Design a protein with these regions (language model features):
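C-terminal helical cap(s) of enzyme catalytic domains, especially alpha/beta-barrels
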Residues: 154-171
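Short, well-ordered coil/turn segments that N-cap beta-strands
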Residues: 30-35, 60-62, 97-101, 140-144
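Conserved, mostly hydrophobic/aromatic
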Residues: 67, 146
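Active-site acidic/histidine proton-transfer and metal-coordination neighborhood
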Residues: 1-66
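Active-site-proximal loop/turn and secondary-structure-junction residues that shape catalytic pockets
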Residues: 39-43, 68-72, 107-109, 152-154
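Intrinsic disorder/low-complexity signal
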Residues: 183-206
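Amphipathic, non-transmembrane alpha-helical secondary structure
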Residues: 2, 6, 18-21, 25, ...
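Gly/Pro-rich active-site loop or hairpin
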Residues: 46, 72-143
């Protein structure tokens, strides 16, 4: 790991050194762009989540590029629920510390921990809905860009946007319902959870 970090530093440079950015002399005349370090999709290649986050934590000017298809494949289908995404980004927050992320998303066919090729999202066991749910509920702290890698590029880009919008709408509806319930419970002098139970019992009796 230290060898990879040192090599990235060697190429990209260190702004505290006199001869910084030797490979990119134009940097002296403008603000340097971020360099994305992407997770790889095969077991024998460098580029696990841990390795990528470690480099981005140590090398200024780099940003993690989390390829969800690759992560899902290397983890033998690890991204299945919103909690799986929460665990991934909690790990990123603890190790990397930043809030800027680029994410690639597409369906993926995988075998023995290796990504074989991208597919349409609907034809893969990697579903976007849990990711959309996580982003809607807990993603406000991130500056995130999601890039469609699907063979149906524009179609699946719109598919992802629609599911994210639906997840946001569901969250707003839940919050509005909880606020209404809390207000009614306060008026009746009871606990909101008690009112929720009464509402569920009334709905079941209908």
């Amino acid at each position: 790991m230290s060898g990879v970090v040192d090599r990235v530093r060697e190429v990209w440079g260190d702004e505290t050194e006199e001869e910084d950015y030797a490979a990119f002399p134009w940097v002296h005349e403008s603000e340097p762009s971020l360099v994305g370090i992407e997770t790889s999709g095969r077991q024998e290649l460098w580029g696990t989540v841990e390795e990528v986050l470690e480099v981005c934590n140590h090398v200024e000017g780099t940003v993690p590029v989390l390829n969800m298809g690759h992560i899902h494949a290397r983890g033998h289908g690890r991204l299945r629920t919103s909690e799986d995404y929460a665990e991934l980004f909690d790990q990123a927050r603890e190790t990397y510390g930043g809030s800027t992320f680029y994410c690639h998303f597409a369906g993926v066919e995988h075998r023995m921990g290796n990504a074989l090729h991208y597919t349409q999202i609907k034809k893969s066991d990697l579903k976007f809905e849990p990711f959309a749910e996580y982003l809607a509920e807990e993603g406000d702290w991130m500056d995130i860009t999601i890039i469609s890698d699907s063979p149906l590029l524009e179609h699946d880009a719109m598919y992802m946007l629609q599911h994210y919008d639906k997840a946001r709408q569901r969250l707003l509806e839940i919050r509005a319902r909880d606020e209404r319930r809390a207000k009614l419970a306060a008026q009746q002098g009871i606990d909101p959870e008690e009112l929720k139970i009464k509402e569920e019992e009334a709905a079941a009796a209908r």
